[in-house]
């Protein structure tokens, strides 16, 4: 238990005198040992896993940028290994969610999950307001496979094409009543 000297603390669980009388109960030694083993393994493979995930990310980026009027959000290389965020013009982000295809994804940025407004972060990195509405955030890990990335690269263009075919905004863009921003 870490606390600044003089900070008044009150016990949450009454009983034994562990942690200077502030926390009753015995530490969960099996869980502590398991956490230590998990941390050792994670740290031992950190660079290898980061390189593997960055390779998956780069393949995903290369495939998604073939979709017309799509935009990678942020810098191509100076980003987290497992982060990919794309904007697709003429599509609303919440419609892009791919649960029906068995894919877990989010719209916008992590800091604005649940908001209908476009992400202030995406706007700050230069994504046009209209395009930020069609944002799709995908996260990858060392547990993902190249086959899963290929599945994404098949599913996302299909969903974008289907949504654009129903979108009045996309129709206006394609018929020249509005100008493309990406």
Question: What is the predicted function of each stretch?
Answer:
Residues 1-50:
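Conserved core segment of the aminotransferase class I/II
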Residues 10, 29-40, 61, 97, ...:
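Predominant activation on well-ordered alpha-helical scaffold segments within soluble catalytic domains
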Residues 10, 71-73, 106:
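Structural detector of well-ordered beta-strand residues that form the stable sheet scaffold
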Residues 28-32, 46-57, 89, 93, ...:
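Generic structural signal for well-ordered, non-membrane alpha-helical segments
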Residues 39-46, 57, 64, 68, ...:
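Structural signal for hydrophobic packing residues in well-ordered secondary-structure cores
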Residues 84-137, 142:
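Conserved C-terminal alpha-helix-loop-beta "cap" of PLP-dependent enzymes
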